[in-house]
Amino acid sequence: MFSPLTKQLIEALQCLPGIGPKSAQRMAFHLLAKSGQAKGLALSDALQSAIRQVGECKLCQIYTEQPLCNICNNPKRDSTLLCVVESPADVVAIEQTQIYSGRYFVLHGHLSPLDGIGPQEIGIPALLDRLRNETIKELIIATNATMEGKATAHYVANHIDHTKIKCSRIAHGVPMGGELEYLDGGTLIHALHSRIPVEDN
């Protein structure tokens, strides 16, 4: 039905989260229409530039073009406070509350043994190195309120149990199964203010 290149574009667009065949088809037709071609080329240029030039901050692993991101490079941030999150979108969600002044560590995932995702795959050794090498007074674990998020939180907490670092987990006004990037600001503010110690069940 579609020309080879049109089909290739539709299939490529389906790699985006939440984009199925119908949505991808609609997007492809929009970009190929004469009125959308300039935007399509601009999108292509922006995507190629970002993929070539954007990497991960060497401290927190958030996306940046520089060795250090703006947060890690900001001397006004509290370097003794470290918040562990699953994704860069979680950093954005917390930053939008404007109440957190510390720094971050982005795991880019959570523990999921059935999927072959262990501590190495989500950078936990790098996190533990950072905790050893920096003067961190409190570690806030802000993983999602899912079984995997909880397992990840307990794994991290158990590995710093012998240190003097205070370890807390954001309180759950965050609903079970919920993800930080979809929460409203009020819920996030409450959760950050109501942190609780991580304890074994």
From Swiss-Prot:
CDD domains, per database record: TOPRIM_recR
Zinc finger (C4-type) residue numbers: 57-72
GO biological process: double-strand break repair; recombinational repair
Pfam family, one: RecR_C
A molecular function GO annotation: zinc ion binding
Keyword Metal-binding: yes
Keywords: DNA damage, DNA recombination, DNA repair, Metal-binding, Zinc, Zinc-finger
Limits of the Toprim domain: 80-175
Function: May play a role in DNA repair. It seems to be involved in an RecBC-independent recombinational process of DNA repair. It may act with RecF and RecO.
Family affiliation: Belongs to the RecR family.
Protein name: Recombination protein RecR
